[in-house]
UniProtKB/Swiss-Prot annotation:
Gene: prpsap2
Keyword vocabulary terms for this entry: Nucleotide biosynthesis
UniProt name for this protein: Phosphoribosyl pyrophosphate synthase-associated protein 2
Disulfide bonds: none
Family affiliation: Belongs to the ribose-phosphate pyrophosphokinase family.
InterPro entries per UniProt: Pribosyltran_N, PRTase-like, Rib-P_diPkinase
Organism annotation: Xenopus tropicalis (Western clawed frog)
Pfam families hit by this protein: Pribosyl_synth (PF14572), Pribosyltran_N (PF13793)
Any one GO biological process: nucleotide biosynthetic process
Annotated function: Seems to play a negative regulatory role in 5-phosphoribose 1-diphosphate synthesis.
The organism's taxonomic lineage, starting at the top: Eukaryota, Metazoa, Chordata, Craniata, Vertebrata
Family annotation (SMART domains): Pribosyltran_N
GO molecular function: magnesium ion binding
SUPFAM superfamilies registered for this protein in UniProt: PRTase-like (SSF53271)
Length: 358
């Protein structure tokens, strides 16, 4: 692949070695060298960025993956963007495969919509274009006042299923909760496979979070001002039904699909349930493998046979701890997106056959 126009500068942030490795793969596909930038922390833990080449009038692309120190990662990105802005870059595009704080995209209790705050900070710093993959909620695109390209990793995961699971025709796609049923349905329809949904105690805690602010109860009667007929009815509390699997998984390979694997307890519980229902092999596939805390150990000790994630987030240490974790490289689609944006070409090819629910 060759970039036909000059004036492209590709920078890698310094959050971790995997970020640099991903940036090198993208640069190699584009036929360019990584830009020279120095990112480091002062003894007082402040982040300092020094752009070591001219970016005046050029299209700058900054690649940043999310490390365990997510807040430092964000500050690195913001300072790099602002440094390029003050150095008179023509455009500044952020390539952030996993958008941090994406789970905090809804109002919960007396909290805040942190995704909206972070999007505003990126735009304020000087970002003119945002490239990411599989946002946790598509509505996050509306938090930005700049163009957003939400690329999809599902073609790479579908290809992995076809090439690495020899008897995938005997598989069934599984949603571990009703909230992930649309994604599972998309996989099932594209692979011409059956669909199963787990409902009950294995549901995500996120989908069941109470949105009450825990204010004191309303006083029913204040003198004669409130009539008994005006009492406001309250929502009944939820009760999860006994765990059930809607769909036949007996004697089949079960492929659980989701967008993020973080705390794996729900995936382990889903795998145990599927084994009890007769599935003889369990795969878990997701775009973003955060794999926090004890995830590698829990996966290794579970009935899950293989966990497949992309390299949107570094997880080399987790792979050493758990051989069941496999990685799919998505640098190809990121490099093609960069090439098209830089050359002013249409991005529609990268979204071909992608529906509203994908």
């Amino acid at each position: 692949m060759n970039v036909t126009k000059g004036g492209l500068v590709l920078f890698s942030a310094n959050s971790n070695a995997s970020c640099v490795e991903l940036a090198k793969r993208i640069a190699e596909r584009l036929g360019v060298e990584l830009g020279k930038v120095q990112v480091y922390q002062e003894p007082n833990r402040e982040t300092r960025v020094q752009i070591q080449e001219s970016v005046r009038g050029k299209d700058v692309f900054i690649i940043q993956t999310v490390s365990k120190d997510v807040n430092t990662t964000i500050m690195e990105l913001l300072i790099m963007v602002y440094a390029c802005r003050t150095s008179c870059a023509k455009t500044i595009s952020g390539v952030i495969p996993y958008f941090p704080y994406s789970k905090q995209c809804k109002m919960r209790k007396r909290g805040s919509i942190v995704s909206k705050l972070l999007a505003s900070m990126m735009c304020k710093a000087g970002l003119t274009h945002f490239i990411t993959m599989d946002l946790h909620q598509k509505e996050i695109q509306g938090f930005f006042n700049i163009p957003v390209d939400n690329l999809r990793a599902s073609p790479f995961l579908l290809q992995y299923i076809q090439e690495e699971i020899p008897d995938y025709r005997n598989a069934v796609i599984v949603a571990k909760s009703p909230s992930s049923a649309k994604r599972a349905q998309s996989f099932a329809e594209r692979l011409r496979l059956g669909l199963a949904v787990i409902h009950g105690e294995a549901q995500d805690a996120e989908s069941d979070m109470v949105d009450g602010r825990h204010s004191p109860p309303v006083v029913k009667n204040i003198g004669a001002a409130m009539h008994p007929s005006l009492e406001i009815p309250l929502m009944f509390p939820k009760e999860k039904p006994p765990i059930t699997v809607v769909g036949d998984v007996g004697g089949r390979i079960a492929i659980i699909v989701d967008d993020i694997i973080d705390d794996v307890d729900s995936f382990v519980a889903a795998a145990d349930t599927l084994k009890e229902r007769g599935a003889y092999k369990i795969f878990v596939m997701a775009t973003h493998g955060l794999l926090s805390s004890e995830a590698p150990r829990l996966i290794e000790e579970s009935t899950i046979d293989e966990v497949v994630v992309t390299n949107t987030i570094p997880h080399e240490i987790q792979k050493l701890q758990c051989p069941k974790i496999k990685t799919v490289d998505i640098s190809m689609i990121l490099s093609e997106a960069i090439r098209r944006i830089h050359n002013g070409e249409s991005m529609s090819y990268l979204f071909r056959n992608i529906g509203v629910d994908d």
